[in-house]
């Protein structure tokens, strides 16, 4: 069970948190689509929460854990598995979790990294539905 708290500006796992007088629990999740680039107007017209972080920090695993749906977001031990902006519908379209490609140590060429930087930058600055970004940090590394 996962919940989102606006008051604490954080996502907590396995802890009921108040949201607008009630509790927000992820009951179901579904992969919707992927974008290789972002254009203003892309998305589904509902609130989006992006998941960002370095390559292989566990962004896709985090989405799977929140949704309690192993395999919803594809994972790999190889950095750079997520190459597109992936949209996942939560609670029958109540909101979207958006899995972003990682930054930093992906085992891809410089041209591919530049494409990702442009895609992520466009999404973060132009999405009209983006309400927050969860940045994952692996505390095991400096």
Which residue ranges define each predicted feature?
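Inter-motif core of Ras-like GTPase G domains
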Residues: 112-140
